[in-house]
A protein has these predicted regions:
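UBL (ubiquitin/ubiquitin-like) substrate-recognition surfaces
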Residues: 1-284
């Protein structure tokens, strides 16, 4: 990583011209442009792989060309061509919110572009090696290769893994625990590329604490858990945690309510001291 960082020092200070209301796209592209491992991987992909006539790969190629231009020298670029490619891809994927020049949410666009990159790269020749490296890393962290989590991964990622999962994949676990016996009644894993966080505080740390706080499901709260095995309602504790954190942790702050009103509060955080350890199973 240090070698890669050295190659990028004092470069990539390139601005993208706003074409209509594309500022949300430009900010998203700047973020993706600075994920160095990803762009190194994409460049290597196009230098080694036999390319298929696939719309996702064509989109990725257009991004690779724009990224190279952005890092060739520090300048201002008008990304007309790539905006056109985005609009065409949005129509093909029936995602019309990105098919025009209207203002949209940047996090939705980040997810849109990550999904396209994933679809383009899941057929790369080194995918099996990437996935095995991920499994090896899990084992190094003390997660058994025979665990329920690894079985979940192998099922979910069968023919569906890419470098995007290595870099951005967030794996979470939900446990339902009997309040009286502390017995785990059920467990469920899930994964995604970004975590939706409700704006319950002006502090990101507090928002995370509330998001991952235990939830009491009991008679008093009128939300008891129904145990299918014993055919009865029980008082339980619902525990939600990050089972394995990603290299790049994307948080979406849910600013819009059901009445389409935006929460404009400023959220405070220290980029150098955000600690996910209290919310991660493997670090508890």
């Amino acid at each position: 990583m240090n070698d890669i960082m050295g190659e990028y020092t004092n470069k990539g200070l390139t601005g993208l011209t706003n074409l209509g209301n594309t500022c949300y796209i430009n900010s998203s592209l700047q973020i993706m442009s600075h994920v160095y491992e990803l762009n190194e991987y994409i460049t290597h992909f196009f230098s080694k792989e036999h390319q298929k006539n696939d719309t996702n790969i064509i989109f990725l190629k257009e991004w690779n060309d724009l990224h190279k231009l952005m890092w060739s020298k520090n300048c201002i670029i008008s990304p007309n061509r790539f905006i056109g490619v985005i609009q065409k891809m949005a129509k093909q994927k029936q995602n019309d919110i990105f098919a025009g020049f209207h203002q949209n949410d940047s996090t939705e666009f980040v997810y849109f572009i990550i999904s396209i990159f994933h679809d383009a790269l899941k057929g790369a020749s080194d995918v099996d090696t990437l996935f095995q490296c991920q499994l090896n890393d899990f084992e190094h962290q003390g997660i058994s290769s025979k665990s329920d989590f690894v079985r979940y991964l192998k099922t979910y990622h069968k023919n569906n893994y890419s470098i995007m999962d290595t870099l951005f994949g967030i794996y979470c676990k939900m446990d339902i625990v009997d309040s009286s016996s502390s017995k785990v009644l059920s467990s469920k894993y899930e994964n995604f590329y970004m975590l939706d966080i409700a704006l319950t505080s002006t502090s990101l740390d507090e928002c995370l604490k509330i998001h991952f706080a235990n939830e009491l499901m009991n008679k008093e709260n009128d939300n008891q858990y129904y145990d299918d095995k014993e055919k009865c309602y029980k008082d339980v504790i619902k525990k939600y945690s990050i089972y394995y954190p990603p290299r790049y942790f994307i948080v979406q702050l849910k600013r819009w309510n059901h009445n389409l009103r935006k929460n404009q509060r400023i959220i405070h955080y220290d980029i150098n001291s955000i600690d996910l350890n209290p919310f991660c199973v493997i670090f508890k």
